[in-house]
Design a protein with these regions (language model features):
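Extracytoplasmic small-molecule ligand-binding "clamshell" domains
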Residues: 25-95
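C-terminal motif of bacterial Sec signal peptides marking the signal peptidase cleavage site
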Residues: 12-15
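Acidic, polar ligand-binding/catalytic clefts
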Residues: 64, 69-133, 203, 208-209
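Short helix-initiation/N-cap motifs at beta->coil->alpha
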Residues: 56, 72-83, 162-177, 213
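Extended ligand-binding regions for polar small-molecule ligands
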Residues: 17, 56-65, 143-145, 216-254
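A ligand-binding cleft/hinge motif common to bilobed small-molecule-binding domains
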Residues: 96-104, 150-153, 176, 181-211
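Periplasmic-binding protein-like
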Residues: 37, 114-121, 187, 191, ...
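Bilobed "Venus flytrap"/periplasmic-binding protein-like clamshell domains
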Residues: 38, 51-61, 118-170, 182, ...
Length: 262
């Protein structure tokens, strides 16, 4: 969430009859979507270097429903918002949590995914509340993620117990190598990793201290037209049932749990 790669999802674009409105995309417009493809299952790189995942499939479905074109651009997490603000990308879709602070510098679509923060630990390690994090020598977070904000609020921003990393894969690797006592990150990403790596000896724990969060698609301040286009397309995808099909491809249905999600 580091080399830059492009992945295009050029979807069919047909001219709409009638007069244009704020939700219509120009005929030759290709929306550049900034994404840090180190956040499976939302975005990752396949063997050919193409961005894939839940966010990509959802955006592709939205583009088809809304008659616009998109192109995914993989880049480091810390460069996503600067790239949006300086015009290098038109949209950021990369598991971005909607926060009041971020709303000061960018616009957000309607929420498209609900998550919370969880604690990833070696199997058998007990964590009853966020207070237990204070007694750990090293708690890992990804810089700029909401896990970073949550742990910083709990322990203090400059607390040496907080170990910051550039991506989820790096931080999980450090935990597996014994360099961390725990990792705090987004629930869907951590649950997906534990489910797909049962031999790693990891488990995750949900805590009531961490509130529910929502992912949104970001656009530049003042670009209400793009936000309207995205919201209209997202609504169509939800109403058609396509959202549910994409969700089921990556995540367990409500009520289902993996062995780790006890």
């Amino acid at each position: 969430w580091l080399a830059t790669a492009l992945a295009c999802s050029a979807l069919a674009l047909t001219a709409c009859g009638g007069q244009s409105n704020n939700a219509s995309a120009p005929a030759d417009k290709v929306y550049r979507v900034g994404s840090n493809a180190e956040f499976a299952p939302f975005e990752s790189l396949d063997s050919a270097g193409k961005v894939e995942g839940f966010d990509v499939d959802l955006m592709d479905a939205m583009a088809k429903a809304g008659n616009f074109k998109v192109e995914f651009k993989h880049q480091p997490w810390e460069s996503l918002f600067p790239s949006l603000n300086n015009g290098d990308v038109d949209i950021v879709m990369s598991g971005v949590t909607i926060t009041d602070d971020r709303k000061q510098s960018m616009l957000f679509s309607d929420p498209y995914f609900e998550i919370t923060q969880v604690v990833l630990v070696p199997k058998g390690k007990k964590v009853a509340s966020s207070e237990d994090l204070k007694n750990m020598a090293k708690v890992g977070v990804v810089t700029g993620y909401t896990g970073d904000f949550s742990v910083s609020k709990l322990l203090g921003n400059d607390n040496p117990k907080i170990a910051r990393f550039e991506s989820v894969p790096l931080i999980i690797k450090e935990l597996e190598n014994g360099g961390l006592d725990s990792v705090v990150s987004d629930s869907a990403v951590i649950a997906n990793y534990v489910k797909n790596n049962p031999t790693k000896g990891l488990d995750f724990i949900s805590l009531p201290d961490f509130t529910i969060e929502n992912y949104g698609i970001a656009a530049r301040k003042g670009d209400e037209a793009t936000i309207k286009m995205l919201n209209d397309a997202l609504k169509k995808v939800r109403e058609s049932g396509e959202y549910d099909k994409i969700y089921a491809k990556y995540f367990a249905k409500e009520g289902e749990k993996t062995e780790a999600a006890k």
